[in-house]
Amino acid sequence: MAGMCCGINVGENEPTSPVEPASRTARRRRMELRQIKFITDIADTTRFKRRKIEDQDEQQQQQKPSLILPATQCENFLTLKFPGEKPKESTLHDDDFPKFGYTSVCGRRRDMEDAVTIRPSFCKKDDSKNQPGFHFYGVYDGHGCSHVAKRCKERMHAIVKEEIEKNDDDDWTQALSQSFTRMDREVGDRAKNNGGASTSTSCRCELQTPQCDAVGSTAVVSVVTPEKIVVSNCGDSRAVLCRKGVAIPLSNDHKPDRPDELTRIEEAGGRVIYWDGARVLGMLAMSRAIGDNYLKPYVIPDPEVTVTDRTSDDECLILASDGLWDVVSNETAAAVARMCLINAEKPASPPRSPGNEAVVAATKDSSDKACSDASILLTKLALARQSADNVSVVVVDLRK
């Protein structure tokens, strides 16, 4: 109230005691200074803590190796880079193998059961260094669990290499058929030897019988040579060749309701039951696969092998799991991949501003980027069309 009575006489005989405005201003300034000092102290403490945390994160980051993955994301090119260490250059050259790109996503499934293998120059028919090598591409679509597909990813190319080197007659059918038989035998023996004991392999069924007997995988494998495109398929994954804009299927899906497969299953004593589609004994939606010991002899690992001569009109090869082919036709997939490869051929306008050398360097590897873009675009198309399975796509540039 003293402030409100400033300059007003209280009585006639009593002296006035006005409150000086300067005292109020000084007190208000002192209060503001206290608030500013308090905020400054908090800011300094927070800044110090933030700097301390950033320094700790930087030290931890320097102690960990960083993974460097090129655009192709092939395991052959995976390198570990440690601080102070120069990265090692790859021994493979761009001219030694076709350009490729791949994508493998879980999609709408809870678990990822697909696997992809790409092995450029994995095998040579003779030891001549000037002789171009053979290139291996594989897509494996597991079911029941992921360990059979992972085992195929780890071992199939090595088995195929051994069979090719043993085969002196260039009999591709025999070499690849024997490879698939060996792969199936390895998967079965591994399950029996492990019995009920778990191994280092982490998977849903923990490699325990009888759950392990209900696990299998499709396999579509392609060996690309300078003159041939060899495709071996077991299951409902698929390989499609794009030649001069025309989609040419290089494999046939092994479905239980295919007339020849239906006859084979019934002659072996099995039945095809239509339960959410045609299924062997009402359980498996494919008639051939690696693994699935509980459905033998109705489900067999014998592949169908096709050998196609390469021509100058060949544009690209597409290998994919049924997560793509269930919703995208051969013609659409070939058209999308072809469009990506053709668009990559168009030269980009060179940058005129200084400091953009990286943009120019990136255009030199446009073929790899084109294959990767094609695989990504096909995967996005499958997901947009509500594919309910894992989606794995490999695109190989066959243009010479």
Predicted features along the sequence, with ranges:
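PP2C/PPM-type serine/threonine phosphatase catalytic domain
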Residues: 1-400
